């Protein structure tokens, strides 16, 4: 399952604190990217962004995010991809049934 994890730094959080925490955890994994981390995006302006994390275990997702929770808050949602053309076809059918 793919999870959209929006993060926003707490007002007291500094760039240096975030950098230190990320590097600490990176070194603890012997310099390896977490296998479950599929994407990492920051929002323009800083202090917020989102992660795409893949895991079938919600407890593992919580464990992945918890080391950062003193620095930032998370809003987490399960997501899935859509095929655009297939969605258009299905929406046409729905619209035709409504007529």
Give the residues covered by each predicted segment.
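Conserved, structured core segments of small domains
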Residues: 1-99
